[in-house]
């Protein structure tokens, strides 16, 4: 009997290998030949699933975004505690999330000058902002306009913290990232509420 190959699963497998290589070596230095060698497939097979490296990067980016969303959805707790844990799920606190951030940064470097990638990045950013807005509104009972403004400040802070941590991990370990996030949350929610309701997740 012929072997049935799951086309989408094979594409995901190749994209995950590409993500590992991009995280370690950078987008410009990674070649389709190198990706093929790392997967154990020929370049012909890889080219069958992806027409070029751009298409590979797009899927690697989407898979990283999906993993981040699963981490956010796994956050438990109520109010500010859930908000804090959800936002922490975006930060590069461990090896897996640092890898995802390396892929995102590679994608952003292309998105800055590429219309298709730029549109994808704007769509993802707006989805993340809307999610943060709903979490802020749920945590603080804020009106829509206030929740949107707070979510924008929070997401801006998260991007800044994350990029510092990716570029200088020795100075930005997980604890410092969490502390910086807590300081930002304290500007959004009443300080005593942040301390009381977020304390449970930091013990």
Predicted ranges, named:
Residues 13, 17-55, 59:
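Helix-turn-helix
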Residues 17-24, 70-71, 103, 107, ...:
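Solvent-exposed, amphipathic alpha-helical segments
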Residues 59, 70-101, 150-154:
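Hydrophobic alpha-helical connector segments
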């Amino acid at each position: 009997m012929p072997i049935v190959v799951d086309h989408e699963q094979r594409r995901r497998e190749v994209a995950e290998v590409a993500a590992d290589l991009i995280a370690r070596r950078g987008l410009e230095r990674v070649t389709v030949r190198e990706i093929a060698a790392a997967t154990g497939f020929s370049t012909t097979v890889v080219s069958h699933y992806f027409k070029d490296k751009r298409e590979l990067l797009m899927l690697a980016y989407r898979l990283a975004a999906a993993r981040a969303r699963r981490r956010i959805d796994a956050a438990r707790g109520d109010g500010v505690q859930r908000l804090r844990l959800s936002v922490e799920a975006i930060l590069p606190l461990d090896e897996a999330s640092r890898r995802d951030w390396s892929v995102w940064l590679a994608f952003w470097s292309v998105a800055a000058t590429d219309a298709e990638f730029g549109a994808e990045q704007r769509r993802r950013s707006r989805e993340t902002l809307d999610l943060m807005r709903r979490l802020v509104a749920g945590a603080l009972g804020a009106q829509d306009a206030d929740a949107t403004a707070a979510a924008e400040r929070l997401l801006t802070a998260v991007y800044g913290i994350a990029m510092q941590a990716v570029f200088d991990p020795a100075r930005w370990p997980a604890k410092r990232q969490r502390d910086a996030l807590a300081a930002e949350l304290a500007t959004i929610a009443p300080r005593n509420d942040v301390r009381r309701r977020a304390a449970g997740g930091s013990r």
